[in-house]
Amino acid sequence: MYFKSIQDSIGNTAMIQIPSEASSSIILAKLEGNNPGGSVKDRPALKMIEDAENSGVLKKGGTLIEATSGNTGIALSMVASIKGYKIIIIMPETVSIERIKTMEAYGAKIILVSKEEDMEGARDLAMQMQSNGEGMVLDLSLIHI
């Protein structure tokens, strides 16, 4: 399959038929691991950013803030990079160095909170930073694990 950009490839992963002796139904599986970021989270990350753009909340050159410790942060970092946004990821210090390095490779600024603060502290800091005008929080549920 040919795509003009990484963004265009998100979600356009192959579907394969899974054989089943127990059912006469056709069972299909979508290979979301073949997204450019290697995760099913690539699709919702793109949707979150596009929704913010389409609603007019996210302006060209804006800064995103996200409290996350998982694949959503990696996917958001990738999509933000593709679309030219800055992104600040806030997460507990217990997150693996591999996750941190992956997000940094996409250009994310990483802020670590203590393990005692955990995701609640990350969420609170994200909201405080948004209140201070340092960027916008995409998802009000905030916690992505």
Features from the language model and the residues they span:
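PLP-dependent amino-acid enzyme catalytic core
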Residues: 1-143
